[in-house]
Structures are given as C-alpha cells and as structure tokens.
Amino acid sequence: MLDIKRVRDNFAEIKEMLLTRNEDLGNLDDFENLDAKRRELIAKTEELKAERNKVSEQISVMKRNKENADEVIARMRQVGDEIKELDIQLNDVEDRFKDMMMRLPNVPHESVPVGTTEDDNVEEYTWGEIPAFDFEIKAHWDLATDLKIVDFERGAKVTGSRFLFYRGLGARLERALMTFMMDLHAEEHGYEEMLPPVIVNRESLTGTGQLPKFEEDVFKLAETDYFMIPTAEVPVTNFYRDEILTAEALPQGFAAYSACFRSEAGSAGRDTRGLIRQHQFNKVELVRFVKPEESYEQLELLTGHAEKVLQLLGLPYRKLKMCTADLGFTAAKKYDLEVWIPAQNMYREISSCSNFEDFQARRANIRFRREPNAKPEYVHTLNGSGLAIGRTVAAILENYQQADGSVVIPEVLRPYMGGKEVIAPK
C-alpha cells in the first residue's frame, strides 16, 4: 500500500508515475475527494467527542451542585446521536478509501525504464554460451517422456491439465535441485532456511499484495477463507506481520522451499505442454527484510544470489531490467532472469527479483526501530526466485541433451544424484 501522505502531497506526480505501469488504477481520481471527506468526518467526529466529554464534566458538576441538568443531558444525547451518524458515514468512507488504496500498484523507482509493453524491458547482459547442436534437438517434454522421468498423461488423468508426475531420476533431479539450491543459499549466501505452510489466510495474501485485486489467480479452499500459496513469498513475508523488529535484526534473509499453486487464469492457451506453466510446481524463494536506505543495494545482492544458481548449473541466461509496464503490481523495481530454452530458441523467465520498498510492509504492518525508544519505521521487503525448480529441470534437459537422447547431469548436481553423470534412455 502506498503512503497516503505521499500520495496526498504529490497527487499529480504520483498519478503520472502510476499511469506508466499499464495497470488498472480503479477510482484513483476519487482519491482527493475521498481523502478530504475522510479527514473532514474525522475532524467533525473528534470535535463532537471533545464536546461530549466537556458536557459530561458539566453534568457531573451540576449534579454535585444539585442543579437541574435536563437541558445539558438532552444536548449530550443529541451529540451522541450525531457521533453515531458520523461514525456510520466515516466507516463507509474509510472502507471505500482503504479498498481504493489496496488496489493501487506501487510507484516505480526513478531508475526503472518507462515502457508500454514487455518489448521495452532493457537487457542488462547475457551470461554463458548458447549451446550449438549438430543433431535435431528435442523439446524438454519429449525428452522427459522418452526418458520416463516425467509423466504428463497420468498427471492429467489423476488431476487435470497442467499437473504431472515426476518419477525415477526425474524425481531425483527435482529433489537434487531443491537441496543444491537450499544448500547454496543457506551455506554460502547466509539465508536462514524456512519450510513454510502452503495454506495461508486472507490477511497474508493481502499483506503481500495478491488480494484483493488478484483473487482469481489463487486457489481458494471451498467454504473457508484459506488459500493455497502461489509462492513462498506470501507466508515468509507475513512471518513478521504486525511486528516491530530491532535495527540489529536487519538485514535478514530467508530461503524457503515450497510447493506453489497457481490457477493461471490469464494464461489459457499458453505453454500448454511441458514444465514451464503448471498449476502446481516447486520453487526456492528468497525473501529479505532490510532498512529503507539499503534496499536497492540489497536488490543487487539478492539478484546475484539467484544468478549464482544458474552460473553453477552452467545454464545460459540474460538479466532484464523490467520497464514500468511489466513490473507487476507490487514491485518498485524488478529484474527478471531468463534462461535459454533451445527448442523454443528463446530465453524464458526463471526468476523475478523485486524490491517492494515499503509497499508490502505497510499492508502487513512490518516495522523496525532504529533505537529502543525510536518511532517505528516500515521496513523494505524484497524477494526473488532462487529458482523455480520445474523451469530449471526444463532448462537442464534441453541444454544438456545429447544426440542419443540422453541428458548429461550438471557437474554441481552429481553429488546430489548419487554420483550419476547421465540420465540415459532405458
């Protein structure tokens, strides 16, 4: 959520910046009227409450002096009725105002390129050599099926489209990647490991920004107010919801492995085959809580941690700085890492690394004190995929495929695969 005072004091500038985001701004133009009405009602209510307190004291004095207080008592009742009526109006305005603020996206950072489509994203650099093949390459879904390490058909039979079974060395590869990533982030990058719940309440999804605007994108448990998480970012960020941290506790980072669940409501017809877009997938997520003045330095650090996974796996990738129209709802600045997928002859997203500044912290009420008695300030939150495991499997299968249909296992994963070097056709 945006800082109300910042929007109030810089409305025209904030509106102009938000319009570059290619997001639905809802009833933003009502901000000034609603804000003024809200402040007017608050002032009137406080004025009447002060009068009620004064009249109450006056009645006490009159009763002690055995004076007739009927008129004053009648006035106090009238004031009480006026306060009740104003409270009803104020609650209505507050609800409308809060709903509007909850649906406004974050303000882009000044370093974010202005753009209208994904074509305006800026490529920072590429890493690694794109492999050259002297044979006809296969898509990862054909490789996985031929090697009998993923079963798409039975996943669809048991559940539905965009579900699958990993089996044999496919299940082992998925598990190896998870353990490798968690070891790297915990032992070398200094993150604390976390295994979060995969079901959260409405407050948690509101805190990280998925609700109320994007409820159709998440799976809701019937007849409850519980949801399946779309990413571990949700439970891990909400770990500190409604808490005040010490300055010494910052910066703080968590690496969390979890299953993720997404309805892909807006993705009909896209990536209908393979591992790129599943309703259920596993991911390692990096979340950081930092002081405001450190957050952009921390964004570079976090992005580097995600890049290190790709580098150690020997997977070619590129780093994109996302333009204003492709930031998503919550980010002030975002980098995407895209891994090379040979069969598609293109880079595909495998990680998004974002600085939300205090946008999530305001929604989730996560604060810190610089000194023991100092006024609490909002932390800045960051997160990034470190990495999405299914897409990493797809990239390994395609980039490491051999002419005989086998797939070489990246060297860094072999200790996690029992020393096995190749996944070969049976």
UniProtKB/Swiss-Prot annotation:
Residues at which ATP binds: 262-264, 349-352
Pathway: Aminoacyl-tRNA biosynthesis; selenocysteinyl-tRNA(Sec) biosynthesis; L-seryl-tRNA(Sec) from L-serine and tRNA(Sec): step 1/1
Molecular-function GO terms, alphabetical: ATP binding; catalytic activity, acting on a protein; serine-tRNA ligase activity; transferase activity
UniProt remark on domains: Consists of two distinct domains, a catalytic core and a N-terminal extension that is involved in tRNA binding.
Entry function: Catalyzes the attachment of serine to tRNA(Ser). Is also able to aminoacylate tRNA(Sec) with serine, to form the misacylated tRNA L-seryl-tRNA(Sec), which will be further converted into selenocysteinyl-tRNA(Sec).
Gene: serS
Protein name according to UniProt: Serine--tRNA ligase
Cellular compartment(s): Cytoplasm
InterPro entries, sorted: aa-tRNA-synt_IIb, aa-tRNA-synth_II, aa-tRNA-synth_II/BPL/LPL, Ser-tRNA-ligase_type_1, Ser-tRNA-synth_1_N, SerRS_1_N_sf, SerRS_core, tRNA-bd_arm
One Gene Ontology cellular component annotation held by this UniProt entry: cytoplasm
Binding locations of L-serine: 231-233, 285, 385
Family: Belongs to the class-II aminoacyl-tRNA synthetase family. Type-1 seryl-tRNA synthetase subfamily.
Enzyme class, first EC level, given as a word: ligase
EC numbers for this chain: 6.1.1.11
Subunit: Homodimer. The tRNA molecule binds across the dimer.
